[in-house]
């Protein structure tokens, strides 16, 4: 029997996020595989026909992982194909681009972009409920005027050679530094193009695939919201200075 090699995991495909179309005739899947050369993971979307039992590749941009069904024949997904927004991201701004594609083929069409780093989304009528990564240590460059942004960007880069930790935990396995970083809740209106964060400051939200109707929405967003707590660190003077850890509610 051949022994398992140290690089064998790079040869496997990892299907994730399988989601059925509203009519149940198709299923979309994000297939992830390791890119050893670039030290990252590539991801493309595949379509499975539940009647013919055939599965085929739909996208090939290597960055397509987050997606939803808009109807029985159309997917909305995130990727980074727009040069204009790629430059903004390189300059320090947070943007996520969205695309539409027919499951029967053809080129994906750019739909819109939001000034947040989106990790998850759910459809709620004509609105999208978004889970976004938010870094309170980083200035909101996307909402600044050019001159203000240049000054803030310079100051931010000058401080990148050190990190300030004032929370516990400040590090998480597989995530790196998590100090002052939260998953916040945002809503994008696909009719007006308005996008805004609706969760309270410094509150951690979790957007699930399935849940009950709950939260500050009058439209039928299928979400479940979990309020998180953070731990605070306190120094207690004594002959041997110690650190005491306790739970504090931030909201």
What are these regions (language model features)?
Residues 138-141, 175-211, 215-229:
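Solenoidal tandem-repeat scaffolds enriched in leucines and small polar residues
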Residues 11-27, 61-78, 84, 115-127, ...:
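Conserved beta-propeller blade repeats
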Residues 85, 89-95, 134-186, 233-234:
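Predominantly five- to eight-bladed beta-propeller fold
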Residues 1-14, 47-65, 89-94, 98-117, ...:
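Multi-bladed beta-propeller domains
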Residues 33-37, 81-86, 134-138, 223-227:
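Short glycine/acidic-enriched loop and turn motifs that connect beta-strands
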Residues 21, 35-36, 49, 102, ...:
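Acidic/polar residues at beta-strand termini and the immediately following turn/coil
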Residues 7-43, 179-181:
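Beta-strand-rich domains and repeat architectures in extracellular enzymes and scaffolds
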């Amino acid at each position: 029997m051949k022994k398992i090699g140290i690089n064998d995991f790079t040869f496997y495909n990892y299907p994730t996020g399988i989601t059925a179309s509203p009519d149940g005739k198709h299923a979309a899947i994000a297939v992830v595989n390791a890119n050893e050369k670039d030290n990252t993971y590539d991801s493309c979307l595949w379509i499975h026909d539940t009647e013919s039992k055939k599965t085929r590749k739909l996208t090939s941009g290597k960055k397509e992982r987050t997606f939803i069904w808009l109807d029985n024949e159309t997917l909305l997904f995130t990727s980074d194909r727009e040069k204009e927004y790629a430059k903004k991201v390189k300059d320090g701004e947070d943007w996520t681009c969205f695309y539409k594609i027919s499951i029967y083929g053809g080129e994906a069409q750019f739909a819109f972009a939001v000034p947040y780093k989106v990790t998850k989304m759910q459809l709620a009528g004509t609105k999208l409920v978004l889970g976004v990564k938010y870094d309170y240590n980083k200035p909101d460059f996307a909402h600044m005027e050019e001159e203000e942004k240049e000054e803030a960007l310079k100051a931010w880069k000058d401080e990148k050679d050190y990190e300030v930790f004032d929370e516990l935990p400040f590090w998480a396995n597989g995530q790196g530094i998590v100090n002052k970083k939260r998953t916040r809740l945002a809503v994008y209106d696909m009719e007006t193009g308005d996008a805004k964060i609706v969760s309270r400051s410094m509150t951690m939200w979790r957007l699930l695939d399935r849940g009950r109707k709950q939260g500050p929405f009058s439209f039928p967003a299928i979400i479940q919201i979990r309020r998180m707590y953070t731990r605070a660190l306190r120094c207690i003077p004594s002959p041997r200075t110690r650190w005491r850890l306790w739970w504090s509610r931030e909201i």
